[in-house]
Regions:
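Short beta-strand->loop structural element characteristic of the AMP-binding/adenylate-forming
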Residues: 118-128, 324
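Active-site phosphate-binding strand-loop segment of PLP-dependent enzymes
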Residues: 127-209, 215-217, 357
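Phosphate-binding glycine-rich loop
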Residues: 46, 51-97, 111-115, 121
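Helix C-cap/helix->beta junction micro-motif
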Residues: 115, 168-169, 319
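PLP-dependent aminotransferase class I/II
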Residues: 13, 24, 53-58, 63-70, ...
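N-terminal "arm"/small-domain region of PLP-dependent enzymes with the aminotransferase-like
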Residues: 3, 7-46, 51, 359
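Pyridoxal 5′-phosphate
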Residues: 32, 92, 272
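Conserved coil-to-alpha-helix start sites within the AMP-binding
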Residues: 103-109
């Protein structure tokens, strides 16, 4: 079975007895409450930056453990607006270097690049996939002014070593929390550990909207105020524009959805952790490299590695198991980052060459997971 065939099977679900993700089923469990709140919002007069957005910002900031949250259009905008705000405040300057994970989704890097800053790739740890602080320190120059840690796949990327590194070198510490909503204990959650954090509420995320959405969290009132203004065309007061801003605002409908889902986020993350624990305990295939858990994890994705990835995926697909790859092409091999094409990043390339994501979500049943585990253990060469 070709890679294209695997994708078609996943997209139409019907040919896969275990889909990678059934969003309809995930959202069905919220349906009665969502129908009520969406009807209520639709009958109102203010659909942009109204009472639902204000309430969600308060509730989300409280859940994360920061004093402030600003709703924006999506996760990319959240990160981009953080950089734009720091530039406007003079805490960053055009051309400054920002350390970023070499192993991440392209959005992290593009947000830096499109802000007029210079992203510098840092190799990950091969076992956790997270940026290695010891590698980061070797990339520091006099132009390095910020560092972005991505809580990749749902695992907390920041520990005391990271905090010490940022403090020692006076770096802005920015979190990409797109994949780790609710990760960590209260008071230690991702999104509250750095100077500012970007959050995504894309529908597939642990806290997913019914469309696009994002947020910035911080304890810095000046930064939050500027992010809010920049996301509203650079305006604080109607028809008065203090900065050349953008259009990036969380709407009332999505905020209402997120308020409903936020109430169950911790419980949903516990279910993800239960599913992940079973995978870790019961997958015994010696050809499968299981993920290493070094810190708190909420399992946005359950990512294994296999030396013969495509053959393994095809064999699983033949048994009705849908899988995906996050991500097949490393950022430094993308045309959009042609200036990185000569970078030597062997750990990143090894990870991107071998990773496979198994189904893991709140709609996955115990029976479906049993079938996945059985298939994974059977497919050996």
């Amino acid at each position: 079975m070709s890679c294209a065939r695997v994708w078609v099977c996943w997209y139409f679900y019907g040919q896969m007895s275990v889909p990678f993700l059934d969003l309809a089923q995930v959202n069905a469990t919220f349906e009665p409450v969502l129908s009520s709140v969406l009807t209520q919002v639709a009958r109102g007069n203010q659909l942009i930056r109204g009472s639902e957005v204000e309430a969600f910002e308060r509730e989300y900031a409280h859940h994360v453990g920061t004093s402030l949250a600003v709703g924006v259009g999506n996760g990319f905008d959240a990160l981009h607006l953080i950089f734009q705000a720091y530039l406007s405040l003079g805490r960053l300057r055009p051309g400054d270097e920002v350390l970023v994970p070499a192993c991440t989704h392209m959005a992290t890097i593009l947000a830096v690049k499109q802000s007029g800053l210079r992203p510098v790739p840092v190799e990950p740890d091969i076992d956790s996939f997270l940026m290695d602080p010891s590698h980061a320190e070797t990339q520091l120059t006099s132009k390095t002014k910020a560092i972005v840690f991505v809580h990749l796949y749902g695992q907390k990327a920041i520990d005391q070593r990271v905090l010490d590194l940022a403090r020692k070198h006076n770096l802005l510490l920015i979190e990409d929390n797109a994949q780790a909503a609710g990760c960590g204990k209260p008071g230690e959650r991702t999104g509250s550990l750095g100077d500012a954090a970007a959050h995504s509420f894309y529908p597939t995320k642990n806290l997913g909207a019914l469309g696009d959405g994002g947020a910035v969290t911080t304890r810095d009132p000046e930064l939050a105020q500027l992010v809010r203004a920049l996301g509203n065309y650079g305006s604080v007061e109607r028809d008065q524009f203090q900065w050349p801003g953008f259009n990036s605002r969380l709407d009332e409908l999505q905020a209402a959805v997120l308020r409903v889902k936020l109430k169950r986020l911790d419980l949903d993350n516990e279910r993800r952790q239960t599913l992940a624990a079973r995978y870790l305990a019961e997958i015994k295939n010696p050809q499968v490299i299981l993920p290493t858990v070094v810190r708190d994890h909420v399992w946005h994705l359950f990512v294994i590695r296999h030396e013969k990835r495509e053959r393994f995926r095809e064999a699983l697909a033949a048994q009705g198991i849908s899988t995906m790859v996050h991500y097949p092409v490393p950022p430094h091999r993308q045309l959009a980052l042609a200036d990185w094409s000569t970078s030597s990043l062997p750990i990143t390339e090894e990870i991107h060459r071998t990773v496979i994501s198994l189904p893991l979500n709140t709609a996955l049943t115990d029976h479906q997971q049993e079938k996945i585990i059985r298939a994974v253990n059977q497919v050996q060469e």
